[in-house]
A protein has these predicted regions:
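Amphipathic, small/basic residue-rich leader segments at the start of a protein or domain
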Residues: 1-142, 154, 158, 162
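Glycine-rich, Trp-frequent "lid" loop and neighboring beta-strands that shape
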Residues: 117, 158-191
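Conserved glycine-bearing catalytic or ligand-binding loops at nucleotide- and phosphate-handling centers
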Residues: 141, 147, 165-166
Length: 191
């Protein structure tokens, strides 16, 4: 058992949370802290927001050190399988996803009205780095929640209400790239 915290043991990551521009970024993301009147988990000021980010990142770090990193080798050995036309994750991957879902770590940057945490993108990317350190493959799965930013930014209110709560609950998220002759041909992408 590793029993490490992949956030508290990384001063480089913690450094970015305290960047001087974060105060302006957070005030914008938090609409000058007006949501504190509507949501119990919304910060009242920058110090409150910073404390929220720090606590959530500490939880991410703890889960990654105590669960995800511990499962990484068995996840690589077992790998996913296709069963009856559906992907079945390795047992360790499923355990990782379950623990992350139980901790409420999906929808980190999505609005509170959809049960997201409404964090700026910087703490989300910090969390993504922590997850990647523990298991880069899991980061590819967990990080898909960032795709929901496109829905949040451009979808109708009806589409947002349909999909964003499900992303925040860890029920759904995918990035599908298909149609090499008519759309997204990833194999043909060149630098």
């Amino acid at each position: 058992n590793i029993m490490a915290n992949f956030y508290t043991d990384n001063e480089d990551i913690k450094f970015h949370l305290g960047h001087p521009l974060m105060e302006k970024i957070v005030a914008l993301k938090e609409r000058n802290y007006t949501e504190a009147q509507q949501y119990d988990n919304a910060p009242r000021d920058f110090e409150d927001a910073f404390d929220n980010y720090d606590k959530v990142l500490e939880i991410v770090g703890e889960i990654c050190g105590d669960v995800v990193a511990v499962n990484a080798e068995s996840v690589d050995a077992e790998g996913p399988q296709v069963v009856d036309g559906h992907v079945k994750y390795a047992a360790g991957t499923q355990q990782n996803i379950d623990v992350i879902n139980q901790a409420g770590l999906n929808g980190i940057s999505l609005p509170r009205k959809y049960n997201g945490l409404n964090f700026p993108i910087t703490p989300f990317i910090m969390a993504a780095e922590i997850v990647a350190r523990a298991d880069a493959g899991l980061q590819n799965i967990w990080g898909l929640q960032d795709c929901a930013e496109t829905i949040n930014e451009f979808a109708s209110d009806e589409q947002k209400a349909k999909y964003l709560p499900r992303v925040c609950a860890g029920e759904t998220c995918a990035m599908d790239l298909t149609e090499p002759d008519a759309g997204s041909d990833l194999q043909a992408v060149q630098l």
